[in-house]
Amino acid sequence: MTEKFQKSSKNIMKIKQKKICAALVVLAVAIILCGVTKWQQNQAEIAMEEAEMERMADVPPLYAGILAEIRQNEMVLLEENQEVLIAAAERAAHPENNVYTFLQGPKSWSEGRTWSGEWSNEYVKGNYFGSFGCGLCCMANIYCTYTDYTCSPWDMYEYARQVSGYSPTRKVGAIGWADMKVTLRKCGFDCSLHNKPESYEKFQEQIKNAKGAVVLVCSRDDDTYWENTGGHYVNISLYNEETDEVFLGDPGGPSRNREFIPLRYVYDALKTASQYQYMLVNDYREENNEWKQDGIDENWVEP
């Protein structure tokens, strides 16, 4: 009985082993067939890609050609306009380079300082231009900076005599606020006259929103920056919010001219004894420019 059971068990094991072997063979064959199929598919795809590449080799590369042509044209434009682009970049990096800041005095002219000119030696009713021309220099700075034209401070003197009530005397040669505003209006500028506000923040905001300003400073009000100055017109522009500074055009101070200074210095030194303390340059309109003077005839030291 036991022998029969053992033989039967061995037979069952053999049968199972045969079935397992058969299954393994089938699985192996399936794997091989799958691999062959995948390889065939890859080969077919490679063949299609090669055929497509051969076909495209005979076709003009339209889009690639267009891109290449565009890039070539861009390079040509860059080369042709290199100086213009460099100048534009320079203007963006250093906007103060576009601001005119004429000097009024004969000493600056005799020393050959940049921005000085022979107008300093013009003689009017007992006074040399160098002793009274700060306001006219400021006006010429505005005209040359914000228009496409140029003029000298002496040109501005002659025009102010024509279109406003400006009439210098032996005692007073400087131009007044009203005549300054009228003359610049004839040049196309919208300007407004102001008194020193009680709040520094209000002054800040006004300067920030204006193209620039002519301000009247006096060391009797504050001598932190200007010393021994009874009354002197200067230009300020290019207000910088981050530093709270402005670019200074000082016709009578060659060592101060073209410096960035704290706006607070200007506010503190505004001449309160004057009818007005500053004039804002708000806008320029070409169609309102009745003068259109262009060119400087006098000898001067250009930057």
What positions do the PLM features span?
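Noncatalytic regulatory segments and standalone regulatory/sensor domains
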Residues: 44-54, 100, 239-303
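N-terminal Sec-pathway targeting helices
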Residues: 10-27
